[in-house]
């Protein structure tokens, strides 16, 4: 790219590598995209050397749908905002607020369309949603789904299946899930799942 040697470096590694970079006195700026817990640790370490810090931490990006919306476009936006890249995008709109006048119709339509999403091999042209990135991520998403299934104040309306027949068996697949709740404090409502779970 024409940059002088040492101007741009890519250093790969896990937490230990990140800690070394954050604590190093010659590093002037740290930018992190990650969890809230990791962000707190990075900010604390960076404060020791007064580094500039930019943090983009896990949370829920909202989609707000009013009763005067173009209904079909709103449903499409919610589906794309939740299930694009199997929900593994930081900016996915995974917390959907819907005006009460259209709430029931919206939920019914989202559930019907979610049930129709073709989950499969990303190389198959018929596939609309592929797998999660790893077993670790599948386990994390399955953990959220387990919490939802055991909660009295949260309802799983569709999806959340991880048991697929061959050739998908053994893969990191989960069907698109739609969850409804009034509990604003439940983990599936407040935390970034990074998987195909829409919360309405």
Feature-to-residue mapping (PLM):
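PLP-dependent aminotransferase-like
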Residues: 1-18
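Short loop/turn motifs at secondary-structure junctions
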Residues: 4, 26-27, 49, 193
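Periplasmic-binding protein-like
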Residues: 29-33
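ALDH superfamily catalytic-core signature
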Residues: 35-184
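Glycine-rich nucleotide-phosphate-binding loops and adjacent flexible coil segments
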Residues: 196
